[in-house]
Amino acid sequence: MNSVEEIEDFYGVYLLVSKSPNPKFAGRTYIGYTVDPNRRIKQHNRGEDAGGARRTSNRGPWTMVLIVHGFPNNISALRFEWAWQQPRVSRRLKQMPELQKKLRKESNFEYNFRILTEMLRMGPWNRLPLVVRWFADEFHREFEARRLTLPVAAFRAREHASQSTAQKCTICAGELMLEQEKEEEKENAERRQGDLVLRCLQSRCPLACHVECLAELVLEPGQYVPVEGDCPHCEGHFLWGDIIRKANGCSDLVDDTDNVDPVVLDEVSDEGE
């Protein structure tokens, strides 16, 4: 329990490579999620009975070659893990035919690294402050430098930056509660969530809408409460909790457009098991 508390708020997605003496298993890869990398690699190498995965049990020893972290919560990390594992099914990755199968003579590690490289270039992941940590020098690869550009839609939003107070919902065009009315209501009673006016996390975006309108727009099948989504005006990615916090007056949310280096490549070869 203490070891988990020491790395509170750490959410990582890692890549393992098998160094099994058995040619059948050597070179196989495994992608997983963890809050404690040191504990997790030990579980994998001790087998399924010790908490390791069935797919890695008795097929090692396994080496954790890299881990991606910096996710805002476990949901975001788990979605990244799933997409990396399932490029043929992922809504974003399945549109890239070059990622649907390994190239000729490409190893499992090289294939997974190629998928990871493309994932870090696309939204929503290229807007997160992700860190890639390397643990094994022999597998270390340089990421191809490619300058990340702001989506065209985000530039269009700047033209309307002066519209700080909206009276109509951007989505349904219905009336919104004015800022002055909200302040008066706050003095008399606690606001209900349905009365909130939601605004984009991007300071230059003029989006203003009802809670229920945005929720209906970004709600995924099987969800009761939204987790994340893309702004219908500027296409900026957001976490639902951050949108609600901003509507409630929190001011510690950073504008995504200020993140000029959202992906940090941090080589750490002396960390590991």
From Swiss-Prot:
Cofactor(s), by name: a divalent metal cation
Name the record gives this protein: Structure-specific endonuclease subunit SLX1 homolog
PANTHER family reported in the protein's UniProt record: STRUCTURE-SPECIFIC ENDONUCLEASE SUBUNIT SLX1 (PTHR20208:SF10)
Zinc finger (SLX1-type): 169-234
GO BP, sorted A to Z: double-strand break repair via homologous recombination
Key word DNA damage present: yes
Record-linked Pfam families: GIY-YIG, SLX1_C
SMART domains tied to this protein: GIYc
Gene Ontology MF annotations: 5'-flap endonuclease activity; crossover junction DNA endonuclease activity; zinc ion binding
Occurrences of domain GIY-YIG (ranges): 9-96
Organism: Anopheles gambiae (African malaria mosquito)
Function statement: Catalytic subunit of a heterodimeric structure-specific endonuclease that resolves DNA secondary structures generated during DNA repair and recombination. Has endonuclease activity towards branched DNA substrates, introducing single-strand cuts in duplex DNA close to junctions with ss-DNA.
Keywords: DNA damage, DNA recombination, DNA repair, Endonuclease, Hydrolase, Metal-binding, Nuclease, Nucleus, Zinc, Zinc-finger
Principal subcellular localization: nucleus
Family designation: Belongs to the SLX1 family.
Top-level lineage group: Eukaryota
EC nos: 3.1.-.-
GO cellular component, as recorded: Slx1-Slx4 complex
